[in-house]
């Protein structure tokens, strides 16, 4: 399985769907290149939900606290336009965002500066007044080049501490509602 995910349905191939390539086209290309793995390639597509790691509970709790405090919430994700609607159904907390820019819909992926600019322009965000959180150092570096404050996410505890330092959360508080 590790070989299959490294050599066939790898991150570079998956990023092409995140950039807007239709899944049917992406899987057809792989089936032509790896006909002996056609069944697994098709299964990867039809069973992709099983590859999702799920939400990080501590992060969802932080998001709930920010929402409860009235903090404006926007999101930017590298995700296929075909599969993101399913993620919206699986993860109710995605409804808490005022807006979400999805790479597959924009035909751009992070860390391309154009996708960050699109978010800033679409939602009239002042880069100097925004905090961008990502688990990728290269994505954080990209937003910092645009004048945004970036935070490289490692774990919910570190994020919570940083948000307390910025005055966005209070020390020792936790939201209990996840509506």
Where are these regions (language model features)?
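N-terminal helical cap/lid subdomain that shapes the substrate entry/recognition surface
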Residues: 1-61, 68-69, 80-83
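Acidic, low-complexity intrinsically disordered regions
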Residues: 9, 19, 44, 75, ...
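Asp-based, Mg2+/Mn2+-dependent phosphohydrolase catalytic module
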Residues: 64, 76, 80-179
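Short, well-ordered coil/turn segments that N-cap beta-strands
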Residues: 71-73
């Amino acid at each position: 399985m590790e070989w299959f995910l490294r050599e066939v349905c790898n991150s570079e191939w998956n990023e092409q769907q995140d950039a807007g390539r239709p899944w049917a086209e992406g899987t057809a290309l792989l089936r032509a290149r790896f006909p002996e793995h056609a069944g697994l390639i098709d299964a990867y597509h039809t069973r992709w939900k099983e590859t999702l790691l799920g939400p990080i509970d501590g992060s969802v709790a932080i998001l709930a606290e920010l929402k409860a405090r009235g903090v404006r919430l926007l999101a930017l994700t590298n995700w296929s336009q075909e599969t993101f609607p399913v993620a919206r159904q699986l993860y109710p907390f995605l409804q808490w965002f005022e807006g979400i820019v999805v790479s597959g819909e924009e035909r751009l992926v992070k860390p391309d500066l154009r996708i960050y600019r699109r978010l800033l322009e679409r939602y009239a965000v002042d880069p100097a007044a925004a905090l961008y959180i990502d688990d990728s150092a290269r994505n954080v570096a990209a937003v910092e080049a645009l004048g945004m404050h970036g935070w490289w996410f490692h774990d919910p505890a570190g994020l919570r501490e940083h948000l307390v330092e910025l005055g966005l959360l209070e020390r020792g508080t936790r939201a209990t509602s996840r509506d």
